[in-house]
């Protein structure tokens, strides 16, 4: 049998119970927060970038009963607060203008918008024609408030993540905190002792 962690690995509240949780390598986590902070949320391209960044984030557990915790790397264990904030950011990034969605469904893209035009009459009064945005005033107002909600949720959740203190682990403190040992000797410690033919008496 190859190397593995000892029986303490499986105790209640131990490493085995955390294998389904989200683990993120510290450098990748800090890089993600830095990139999210620099994104222009008001632009659709920026919101699309958020989706890509979150999809690319590796949250897999870095160890198993047969794989020792990585050496020379620090990992953050994402708790419910962090996962919730990431979920809010993911949902906020999915915001799209209703007019854009309708155009996309109709197979229409890049419709040139007519600019606002102002006409002066002979009497000196002015009339303004609203630009063609493909949406009604009601839809524009709905979009504005929904976008404002999405933008606020994104920035609040990002600030929360930046200020959050997450549990961090590296190999030595991981194995010390959980009281586990890795190796062939640890794996064989639970094996039954070899059969004995009886007590051994010293020679007279």
From Swiss-Prot:
Its main location: virion. Residues 112-132, 185-204 are annotated as: Disordered. One of its GO terms (molecular function) is structural molecule activity. GO terms for cellular component: helical viral capsid. The keyword Lipid biosynthesis does not apply. Residues 191-204 have a biased composition (Pro residues). It comes from the Viruses. It is found in: Virion. It holds the Pfam family TMV_coat. InterPro entries: TMV-like_coat, TMV-like_coat_sf. Residues 117-132 have a biased composition (Low complexity). Keywords: Capsid protein, Helical capsid protein, Virion. Belongs to the virgaviridae capsid protein family. Capsid protein self-assembles to form rod-shaped virions about 22 nm in diameter with a central canal enclosing the viral genomic RNA. Interacts with the 40 kDa protein; this interaction may play a role in vector transmission of the virus. This is Capsid protein. It comes from Tobacco rattle virus (isolate PpK20) (TRV).
């Amino acid at each position: 049998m190859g190397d593995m962690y000892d029986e303490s690995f499986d105790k209640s509240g131990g490493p085995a119970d955390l294998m389904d949780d989200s683990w993120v390598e510290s450098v990748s986590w800090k890089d993600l927060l830095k990139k999210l902070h620099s994104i222009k949320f008001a632009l659709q391209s920026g919101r699309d970038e958020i989706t890509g960044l979150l999809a690319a984030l590796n949250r897999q557990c870095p160890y198993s009963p047969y794989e020792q915790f990585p050496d020379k790397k620090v990992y953050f264990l994402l708790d419910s607060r962090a996962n919730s904030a990431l979920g809010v950011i993911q949902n906020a990034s999915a915001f799209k203008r209703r007019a854009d969605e309708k155009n996309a469904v109709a197979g229409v893209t890049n419709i040139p918008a007519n600019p606002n035009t102002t006409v002066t009459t002979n009497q000196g009064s002015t009339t303004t024609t609203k630009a063609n945005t493909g949406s009604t005033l009601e839809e524009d107002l709905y979009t504005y408030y929904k976008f404002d909600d999405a933008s606020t949720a994104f920035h609040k959740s990002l600030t929360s993540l930046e200020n959050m203190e997450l549990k961090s682990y590296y190999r030595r403190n991981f194995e010390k905190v959980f009281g586990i040992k890795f190796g062939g000797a640890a794996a064989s410690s639970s094996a039954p002792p070899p059969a004995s033919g009886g007590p051994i008496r010293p020679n007279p």
